[in-house]
């Protein structure tokens, strides 16, 4: 093996500290595995509809979903319908969409309902953003149940910066409108919610005694900030983070999930009474 090959392999490996943290949390009584999707389970792509989870990540996540005392969840900025379409999550995986504004907790879950005032405000927000997009080649809008997203990934940097600045100048003081910066996006919403609230909510309804969360975007910092002692937070990428641990890219998330599946499978098997002598 060449030095370059060894270096590439080393970069793919999880750190010993992260491996130990995974081993420890795998033994918790009830484990919540909560993952961001884009940039975490799936590589970032030019068109949102083309995103798909890496096969290894999807397989390990599905394996975790069927283990005893283990809950899997996706916490995404995507609308729930979009998240389901691209992620194809295991049937019992809980879903938090639109940065916490939407939730699917199983059959019978009700959808998000906006008040008339919120609907009117959302229409105003879209009209503002439509005018901006007309003058900013490469930008586009994405509608969500509670907001509109200004995408700038395909625009030149100067065009993207000007478009976001124009949107902020009009909307940041508008009462009832909430803005979030993401990677080449500006999220607008008429519902004040965050991925942090999503993590806290899922912990409460599942009774989780330990949470592992991984995410790549600035909006994932809200979720990382809500983690408690004994939880494991993982930043995907090289940007600033308050997470205890870091991996470089979605391919490393696949490795993380595979290690977690292995360790959690061992932990729940050791705690399950045998039937050989019965």
Go through each PLM region and give its residues.
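Mg2+-dependent phosphoryl-transfer enzymes with acidic/Ser/Thr/Gly-rich catalytic loops
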Residues: 2-15, 28, 191, 196-278
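Short amphipathic alpha-helices and their capping/turn segments at secondary-structure boundaries
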Residues: 13-29, 82-89
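Asp-based phosphoryl-transfer active-site loop
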Residues: 26-46
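Active-site phosphate-binding/coordination module
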Residues: 52-143
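Substrate-recognition "cap/lid" segment bordering the active-site pocket of phosphatases
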Residues: 98, 105-123, 127, 180-208
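Short amphipathic alpha-helices in soluble, non-transmembrane regions
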Residues: 125-129, 162-171
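Histidine/lysine/aspartate-rich catalytic loop segments that bind and position anionic ligands
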Residues: 147, 167-186
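A short secondary-structure junction motif
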Residues: 149-160
């Amino acid at each position: 093996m060449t030095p370059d090959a060894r270096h590439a392999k080393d970069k793919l490996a999880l750190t010993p500290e992260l491996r130990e943290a995974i081993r420890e949390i795998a033994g918790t009584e009830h484990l919540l595995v909560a993952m961001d999707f884009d940039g975490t389970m799936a590589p970032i792509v030019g068109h949102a509809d083309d995103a798909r989870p890496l096969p290894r990540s999807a397989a390990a996540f599905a394996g975790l979903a069927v283990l005893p005392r283990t809950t899997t969840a996706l916490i995404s900025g995507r609308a729930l319908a979009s998240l389901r379409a691209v992620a194809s999550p295991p049937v019992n995986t809980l879903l938090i969409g639109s940065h916490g504004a939407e939730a699917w907790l199983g059959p019978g879950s009700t959808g998000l309902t906006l008040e008339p005032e919120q609907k009117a405000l959302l229409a105003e927000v879209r009209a503002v953003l439509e005018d901006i997009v007309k003058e900013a080649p490469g930008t586009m809008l994405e509608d969500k149940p509670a907001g509109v997203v200004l995408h700038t990934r395909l625009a030149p940097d100067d065009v993207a910066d000007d478009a976001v600045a124009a949107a902020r100048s009009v909307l940041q003081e508008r009462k009832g409108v909430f803005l979030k910066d993401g990677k080449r996006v500006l999220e607008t919403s008429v519902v004040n919610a965050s991925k942090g609230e999503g993590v806290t909510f899922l912990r409460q309804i599942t009774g989780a005694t330990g949470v592992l969360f991984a995410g790549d975007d600035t909006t994932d910092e809200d979720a990382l900030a809500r983690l408690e002692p004994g939880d494991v937070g993982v930043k995907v990428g090289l940007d600033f983070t308050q997470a205890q641990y870091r991996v470089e890219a979605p391919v490393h998330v696949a490795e993380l999930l595979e290690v977690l599946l292995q360790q959690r499978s061992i932990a729940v098997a050791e705690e399950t009474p045998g039937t050989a002598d019965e």
